[in-house]
């Protein structure tokens, strides 16, 4: 859904007022900890497990792998799952308003100590896996992990795990003794290592230079042993592994390095998750400053997962931290991303993480960080806060941005900003699901409005730390009345007086000031705010969240196909659970009609899969092209575009695994289905079809396959 609105005249709302101070409402189903498909009402707190809290010193590594002082930031420092449990139970996280935690990859990592340039390195970060079906003992046992899930859920906190199926661990192609040779284990049983890889578990194409997407997918990231996802053993193993963690009760998945794995395989992976136990999943696709990537948008819109919103993060850092852009640039980012992401509310927003310099610099004015937090917490998307941000941690690049959290103070201004604003996501659906509309702007001031039905939040930010701003002519959707700042003046905000037609009285926004004013009202007509997951096969139950659905069952529409009765498994005013009907594969608009027949808004771009999915590598040989031409693939199922050149898969690759004039691409297709397909050449609007009869093959019921054909002139 496109959720950035251009400024328009506000409509007066003749409704009773809810003033700026509020208390959390009783949890509705859409805001429940049991809602694993929707994180729009949540605030995520990212924890680097080893650097947070040592709750069980007995599981600390011994010898040279451990530094209890955390002086060498490339060694283990002792943080574990029991430490996180302790901080859940003592109220530090719940007091901050955190409702989801994202923890380091929990799987067993290598035990070797690797010396790079004279410095010892360990797998403290969790990204050097050896066995995806066992735990990292430095973090805890399976029982400890289960205790973490139970403790978090008891405090209404969801648990997201980092998952890095791109690679195992560092390896050397000519030194089998280096580290652990990238070896991969299946619950303790060795599957193979990087050298003498007779099973072809890994890629052996050298290291990536990041020059092309293909280069980044099929070559190694640095010295990490790159898994071959076109290998059936690897494919089945990774899908079985994530199902194990789903069975343990996780609520979400953060996928590492999604830009560096075959997109078709990842879609089949997400189908495996969504068809089994769907949870909110988001991937890491790094974008640099001012980088806008159509490939990034396409992946978010078609893969079945959302993304970490680096475009958002980089712009927030430019505007609030580095002063290299202004509020017009911030507005342009909001407008552009709303147009480019089909579900912009599902993208995970942040201001820093373990792969970037920390937002705060030790000598910087703290108000910059506090304003960036306020903006992120009240903007579209799912906000994620990196551990220690609330304690003003500073630090440059890896590993300095991964230090041990220095304290657990609840009195810092940053902690209190989060504490005051995080509950809005549960209490006011305008923050969780609403559109975004600029209401007042200059280089230093942005006043924006979030709106969902009759629910409204207005946020004013003056990033100029030295000069106040005189605000006149502000028009909002707030009903007539006086509104207290939700922050209670913590960032020098003020009360807002609103007259008829939403016109605000003139006021002065303090230097460095930030204020949030909000209003809630019952939603009388059905309004969809979120659908999750956004891709699954018929028969899978999906969750529709919003307001005003009513208490009696109505009807859910997938395109023109109506679903009612027993296929709607749950219907409440804020949440509907419905089984996907037996419709053909393809994209559908979803809408809801309540029991009285009143229709909701349309939620678009839902993909019904043609069935369970497998990843298949399509190869076409001797397809010569003119300069500017590329080869694409289409066929008889929706996953291949249903013979529509505009929806064809590609452009295909021709540099790494196969070389020009041979082309290849890994594609997610329905398992066990006989498929007809052809290749075509595209250059702009000109399409040249392959000649001859359609190619035909039957996809495997599980695992992967490669289909290799010659171009038919």
UniProtKB/Swiss-Prot annotation:
The keyword Secreted appears for this protein: yes
Region described as C: 434-522
Co-factor binding comment: Binds 3 Ca(2+) ions per subunit.
UniProt binding sites for Ca(2+) 3: 342, 604
Spans annotated as A2: 230-433
Spans annotated as E: 610-713
Domain description: May consist of two protein domains: the one in the N-terminal side cleaves the alpha-1,4-glucosidic bond in starch, and the other in the C-terminal side catalyzes other activities, including the reconstitution of an alpha-1,4-glucosidic linkage for cyclizing the maltooligosaccharide produced.
Protein's name in the database: Cyclomaltodextrin glucanotransferase
Top-level taxonomy: Bacteria, Bacillati, Bacillota, Bacilli, Bacillales
Gene that encodes it: cgt
